[in-house]
Structure formats: structure tokens, C-alpha cells
């Protein structure tokens, strides 16, 4: 079973994502801070990470860069997520490129688009 690590500090969003992915056949792991996400990644070697951009301890962009800098993280897909209320909230194209992320999704979630992105990156569960 393919594993997905959800790094999200909002417990409601974390539960929605984890439950939805589990219902679609994926094993889910969770972390609530950037540092916890990095630690879980190193311990559990997930197939994909969904990482909120605004996290306690380290931003999602920092988490992405750090994981992509690890030998085991170079080929692991990472999708950044962010609430977008205005253009000011949206990461710039430069920030998105510099993060080394493999995708970007906005909140509130379009679960169909989320599942399509997951399947594009790691295939069916």
C-alpha cells in the first residue's frame, strides 16, 4: 500500500485529507509541524508528501527544500498546499520553483483535483 504523509497543522484539514486518502486506498501518516514532517519522512519513507505552506517551526517551502536535499527525498514527490484568499496569499512562481515541489494545490480543497494529482504522481493506491 502506498503511503502519503500529510503535513498540516490544522487538525480539521489533516483529518479531511487523511480520511479521504484512506478511503481511496492509501495509507496515511500525519505530522503537525514542519520539523515533525521531516522526522516522519526520515522514519517512515512515504511515497508522497502533502505539505501545508504555513506551518509552525518551518514553512512548507523549507520542509520541501530540506527533504529534497536528502538522498531519499530527491525522488519523493511533494505537493505544497496553501489557503488562497487573495493574490497576496498565493506563493510567487519563484517561490514555487525554489521550493522544488512537484505540485501545488489551493485550499479549500478540490478533492477530485487532489486525488488526480496524487494518482498522477504515485499512481493508484
Question: Which residue ranges define each predicted feature?
Answer:
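Conserved acidic carboxylate
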Residues: 8
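Charged docking surfaces used in two-component/phosphorelay signaling
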Residues: 15-23
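Short hydrophobic/Thr-rich beta-strand motif most characteristic of the beta2 strand and flanking loop
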Residues: 25-32, 40
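Residue-level signal for the "D+5" position in two-component response regulator receiver
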Residues: 30, 55-58
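Acidic catalytic/metal-coordinating carboxylates
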Residues: 33-36, 59-62
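Active-site residues of response regulator receiver
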Residues: 52, 82
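Alpha4 helix (beta4-alpha4-beta5 surface) of REC/receiver domains from two-component response regulators
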Residues: 62, 85-105, 116
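Receiver (REC) domain switch/active-site region of two-component response regulators
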Residues: 110
